[in-house]
């Protein structure tokens, strides 16, 4: 059972701002989310919908929709910025 990982335009812009090393690690993580949307280390967020996974100093915030087998990435950013309201 493989999930579809959806990257909205806003997330694609966030990815474009990352350095090559961080981008490579995050891309690997996104590929892993296709097979296992709740990998070890992923945590349910408190106070808002979604999950988060650590990728070095970066965080990937996403929602899981099991009925339609989708993982929608909400935000990708540095750990100091990603939890702040925009």
Task: Tell what function each PLM region has.
Residues 28-54:
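A short, surface-exposed loop/turn module that caps and links secondary-structure elements
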């Amino acid at each position: 059972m493989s999930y579809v990982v959806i990257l909205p335009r806003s997330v694609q812009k966030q990815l474009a701002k990352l350095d090559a090393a961080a981008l490579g690690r995050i891309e690997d993580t996104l590929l892993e989310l296709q097979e296992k949307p709740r990998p070890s280390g992923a945590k349910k967020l408190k106070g808002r919908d979604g999950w988060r996974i650590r990728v070095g100093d970066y965080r990937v915030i996403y929602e899981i929709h099991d009925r339609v087998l989708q993982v929608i990435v909400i935000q990708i950013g540095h750990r100091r910025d990603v939890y702040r309201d925009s």
